[in-house]
Amino acid sequence: MVDRKRARELASEFLRKGDPTGWFEVLYKEGEAGKSVVPWADRGANSDLLEFWNAHPQPTDGKKALVIACGLGDDAQQLAAWGFETTAFDISETAIRMANKRFPKSAVKYSVADLFQPPAEWERAFDFVFEANTVQALPVKIREQAIQKIAAFVRPGGKLLAIVRGREADEPLGELPWPLTRTEMNEFVRAGLTEGSFEEYFDNEDPPARRFRVLYTRL
């Protein structure tokens, strides 16, 4: 079972201060120092991404990909290995520094950036955008804005793969990570994307977590 205690403590602390994203840098710093666990830093590509790709490989030749909140870089490295010209960003300077240190010869362009204030040149600039576990780490009140920002990275004809924890609307939100409802996921459609496939399943975590894995396209 993954230890999320410190992540939850920091998230609560920063939410009380009105800073819903400041805790990520603190957690990565503590993780680098061996003082805390970064729950999502598996040091391997996302298994749900790999499973999707094995079943639904996407064209990569001459295509540009973007990884949202890339952390230590494993998913970005995987997309680059599949052939994408890959950009990856995180709000945590420590995470990006660690990614560059782990992959010093990487072709991935790693950047420190804020999802809510991204570089203007990224708007509608990518053929494939990968989002996993970011929105579920944000409070409900800013999720709509986060989803709109993520959708805006997808160029016409491009695709977005989103993998999140899922729940029914009448189920409690619970603790971080906070699962999303189908209604919340539909915000990607309201942001201009078209839902291509929707998968619901339980993953291999202990205990298993309910997941939504959704592929969107900008027509």
What are these regions (language model features)?
Residues M1-V67, G71-W122, L138-L219:
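Class I (Rossmann-like) S-adenosyl-L-methionine-dependent methyltransferase catalytic domain
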Residues F130:
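A conserved beta-strand element that flanks and buttresses the S-adenosyl-L-methionine
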Residues N133-A137:
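Short catalytic micro-motifs in class I SAM-dependent methyltransferases
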